[in-house]
Amino acid sequence: MTAMRNAEVSRNTLETKIAVAINLDGTGISRLNSGVGFFDHMLDQIARHGMMDISVECQGDLHIDAHHTVEDVGIALGQAFSKALGDKKGIRRYAHAYVPLDEALSRVVLDISGRPGLEFNVEFTRARIGEFDVDLVSEFFQGFVNHAAITLHIDNLRGKNAHHQAETIFKAFGRALRAAVELDPRMVGIMPSTKGSL
């Protein structure tokens, strides 16, 4: 029987107090309370399209702005993801996804490599989506990548509506993550690396 791939992480600093939980083999259920509505909407895309159960509770210094909240949630989720994934034996490791939303199209390619790296090629058509600063999208992914130790390439190939651009990115990320962590029946107990470790 396959072990449960889930984890919980708490992160407390002078800027944020965060508790996250993730189940890599979930059903897409999310319980999100970051205090930033649009960000919760994007995290829901990861859960729903990644078929992962994700819980986020955050109290952040939103009287300043959302930067610390978004970045620190990325860090905590990256830590929880790495913890839940365990030794990585049997996973597919590499994956990609293209997701459209009306005029927008994004591509996400990732490698659960053990080496953190982010290539973020997105030119948003405006600086804010409602009250949400679009610069924080890359901050979230940088925080996640650094602590999940994955290589992640994000490209928005086209788009005129900034909300659509962001949503296609998060949906594609969820779908690619789901595919990469999937257990390959031909790789049971095998590390997906010629080095023997990731």
Swiss-Prot record:
One Gene Ontology molecular-function label? imidazoleglycerol-phosphate dehydratase activity
**Catalyses which reaction?**
D-erythro-1-(imidazol-4-yl)glycerol 3-phosphate = 3-(imidazol-4-yl)-2-oxopropyl phosphate + H2O
Record the organism: Methylobacillus flagellatus (strain ATCC 51484 / DSM 6875 / VKM B-1610 / KT)
What's its EC? Answer: 4.2.1.19
The UniProt family comment states: Belongs to the imidazoleglycerol-phosphate dehydratase family.
The first-level EC class reads lyase
Top-level taxon in the UniProt lineage: Bacteria
Give the chief site where it resides. Answer: cytoplasm
Q: Which PROSITE patterns match?
A: IGP_DEHYDRATASE_1, IGP_DEHYDRATASE_2
Q: In which pathway does it act?
A: Amino-acid biosynthesis; L-histidine biosynthesis; L-histidine from 5-phospho-alpha-D-ribose 1-diphosphate: step 6/9
User: What is this protein called in UniProt?
Assistant: Imidazoleglycerol-phosphate dehydratase
Which GO biological process entries does UniProt record here?
A: L-histidine biosynthetic process
Which SUPFAM superfamilies does UniProt cross-reference here? Answer: Ribosomal protein S5 domain 2-like
Q: Which UniProt keywords are listed?
A: Amino-acid biosynthesis, Cytoplasm, Histidine biosynthesis, Lyase
